[in-house]
Amino acid sequence: MEIQDYTDSEFKHALARNLRSLTRGKKSSKQPIAILLGGQSGAGKTTIHRIKQKEFQGNIVIIDGDSFRSQHPHYLELQQEYGKDSVEYTKDFAGKMVESLVTKLSSLRYNLLIEGTLRTVDVPKKTAQLLKNKGYEVQLALIATKPELSYLSTLIRYEELYIINPNQARATPKEHHDFIVNHLVDNTRKLEELAIFERIQIYQRDRSCVYDSKENTTSAADVLQELLFGEWSQVEKEMLQVGEKRLNELLEK
């Protein structure tokens, strides 16, 4: 058995624990809603977590694949062996956990917020279809953050984590970040054309909702294109200055 392998019983044990902790204090819904989340690394997707938690008065289960990586039975050994490259070896475990949780929790009709990047169209399309077949209203929420700002955030996050625990710090490869950014608009357009989402919303980091398909007739992809690659607002310029200052402070430590 390789170090990245895990047994079926180890996986089931972790799954049962996640089901218990994620549903604590939550109720199932007669008309469940599932929100798929998209945006590049460092864009600030947790902003949407907070908005939706408030909107649903806490009655929504957040499924975030990254949070399951550390549950891999050999996580510490993988960290020691591969350092920051260990993400490649925990990917399978975390992905399978997300899939299993979505299947189980949707059968129980909980409101769901499923974290993703929208790197491809296939995963959100498949997930949306599965949930629609189970009677869910499926929505898409995107966070639109200028690529320079999101990549800067990944660098800050890495340095902050590195100070706490060098083994656990996870750098985001720039090509991985840029790949998501460069496909975000096209993938949003494809998903819009498939018309599988009953609602598409676009948020910015300052928590403002800048697009809602229930109110806007324009294309979400066009709005996203402008927000990602168009003119910089004053707020964005200030965010960049603050971020660069923070990164320099961390690098000087």
Swiss-Prot record:
Coiled coil: none annotated. Its EC number is 2.7.1.176. The active site is at D66. It catalyses: UDP-N-acetyl-alpha-D-glucosamine + ATP = UDP-N-acetyl-alpha-D-glucosamine 3'-phosphate + ADP + H(+). Induction: Conflicting data is available; found to be a member of the pezAT operon (upon ectopic expression in E.coli); in S.pneumoniae strain 0100993 is found in an operon with the 2 following genes (SP_1052 and SP_1053). Changing T120V: Very slight reduction in toxic effect. GO terms for molecular function: ATP binding; kinase activity. Keywords: ATP-binding, Kinase, Nucleotide-binding, Repressor, Toxin-antitoxin system, Transferase, Virulence. Disruption phenotype: Strains with a pezT/SP_1052/SP_1053 disruption have partially attenuated virulence, they take longer to develop a terminal infection in mice, although they grow normally in liquid culture. A double SP_1052/SP_1053 disruption grows almost as well as wild-type, showing the effect is mostly due to disruption of pezT. ATP binds at G39, Q40, S41, G42, A43, G44, K45, T46. It is an enzyme of class 2 (transferase). Belongs to the zeta toxin family. NCBIfam families: antitoxPezT_Strep. Toxic component of a type II toxin-antitoxin (TA) system. Phosphorylates UDP-N-acetyl-D-glucosamine (UNAG) on the 3'-hydroxyl group of the N-acetyl-D-glucosamine moiety, yielding UNAG-3P. UNAG-3P inhibits MurA, the first committed step in cell wall synthesis, which is then blocked. Upon expression in E.coli results in decreased cell growth and viability, followed 3 hours later by growth restoration; the toxic effect and phosphorylation of UNAG are neutralized by coexpression with cognate antitoxin PezA. Forms a PezA(2)PezT(2) heterotetramer. The heterotetramer is much more stable than either of the proteins alone, and a specific mechanism may be necessary to liberate the toxin. This is Toxin PezT.
